Design a protein with these regions (language model features):
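Glycine-rich beta-strand-turn "strand-cap" elements at beta-sheet edges
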Residues: 2, 41-50, 76-105
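An amphipathic, aromatic/His-enriched active-site/gating alpha helix that lines ligand/cofactor pockets
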Residues: 26-38, 57-92
Length: 105
């Protein structure tokens, strides 16, 4: 069964990469038990720590969309928005076929 994937980069204002990464890691903890969450990774560029990447895998797009209703998630989004260097770009939406590290795919 295919899954819904989302992969995107967030560019933050100078020096705020670590702070945004911490906010996103907290978001990953909140959604880790949400229905359909298979993977929520937060990464930083080695050469540019103010570029933060998020990779998500969900059972469905609906599960991803519903994760925004998890208590605390909207508050974290509100904390993150002022750190961004502009409006976030739309991430890449992917059909995840499977692979190492994704159980039950």
């Amino acid at each position: 069964m295919n899954r819904y994937g989302l992969h995107g980069k967030l560019q933050v204002t100078a020096g705020n990469g670590p702070q945004l990464a911490q906010i996103l890691l907290e978001a990953s903890r909140l959604v880790s038990t949400a229905k359909g969450c298979r993977l929520y990774l937060v990464s930083q560029e080695d050469t540019s720590p103010d570029e933060v990447w998020v990779t998500e895998v969900w059972d469905s797009k609906e599960d991803h969309d519903n994760s925004l209703q998890v208590p605390g998630v909207k508050e974290l989004i509100s904390q993150a928005m002022p750190l961004l260097a502009g409006r976030p770009e739309k991430g890449q939406e992917l059909t995840v076929l499977g692979g190492a590290g994704l159980s039950n795919l």
